Amino acid sequence: MTDKYAVFGNPIAQSKSPFIHTEFAKQTQQDLSYEAILAPVDQFDSSLVAFFADGGKGANVTAPFKEQAFSMCDELSEMAKLAGSVNTLFNLPYGKIGGDNTDGVGLVNDLEMLFGSLKGKRVLLVGAGGAARGCILPILQHNVAQLIICNRTHEKAEQLQTLFNEYGNFFAKPIEELISPFDLVINSTSAGLSGQLIALPSVIVDETTDCYDMTYSQQTTVFNQWAQAQNARKTADGLGMLVGQAAKSFSLWRGITPDTGSVMRKLRESLAQEAID
């Protein structure tokens, strides 16, 4: 019998998750289906419960439901508890729901594949929303020398410092106090999707700095355009993070780790074709 999986979001038509997980299933010979489900904003909980009641084995969750999914879980991983949100759900016995957050694992795996080991690096994390919170612990666990977080609203960054400072060398700094280059700058904000960019001092990037945008698009993202203008060493978008977090979800569900490289290549080709069309 084919096992059922899905991703819930609103909007959801743009989701690459069905393609990614279908490709993973093909390469690992797993008998499963994976669909995108548009959940009404005020009916996510009932949509998820109905999916699991109908035999769904597991689900991914994207905006705007990650925090709501967190609150519905009966069992949570330590990563999910600290992230305060989940993107991966499990249908447990007796009608219970389990939750995990694989975003941070997807990010750090992509960062180290692109830029080398994080160990000993000075890292700046731009933004203090849910995307940032889900990635702080995995970054600190990779033995960075220092992780600085900045945000338009400094108080939000300070709240995350209080939550995570026991896990490593982690500090919140006002944007105006950023006065020297970092080894790695990560943009966790989605402002670039609407053509916006947080005003960052150019001094944080030089020719030795790698820059990473958690968002992705057919063209170079607004943040990466800015980074390239500051002569950054390398820039990359978040497509690898997307595939990486999906691979971690898949391995948690199926007990097998898929190859991400071939799926990344197909997605890049698809995005390039969309840009032409």
From Swiss-Prot:
Gene Ontology molecular function: any one: shikimate 3-dehydrogenase (NADP+) activity
EC number: 1.1.1.25
BP-aspect Gene Ontology terms: amino acid biosynthetic process; aromatic amino acid family biosynthetic process; chorismate biosynthetic process; shikimate metabolic process
Disulfide bonds: none
One matching Pfam family: SDH_C
Keywords in alphabetical order: Amino-acid biosynthesis, Aromatic amino acid biosynthesis, NADP, Oxidoreductase
Pathway info: Metabolic intermediate biosynthesis; chorismate biosynthesis; chorismate from D-erythrose 4-phosphate and phosphoenolpyruvate: step 4/7
Protein name: Shikimate dehydrogenase (NADP(+))
Its job: Involved in the biosynthesis of the chorismate, which leads to the biosynthesis of aromatic amino acids. Catalyzes the reversible NADPH linked reduction of 3-dehydroshikimate (DHSA) to yield shikimate (SA).
InterPro entries in the cross-refs: Aminoacid_DH-like_N_sf, NAD(P)-bd_dom_sf, SDH_C, Shikimate_DH, Shikimate_DH-bd_N, Shikimate_DH_fam, Shikm_DH/Glu-tRNA_Rdtase
List of residues binding NADP(+): E78, G127, A128, G129, G130, A131, N151, R152, T153, H154, E155, K156, G238
Assembly and oligomerization: Homodimer.
Active site (UniProt): K66
Enzyme class, UniProt record, top EC level: oxidoreductase
Domain of life: Bacteria
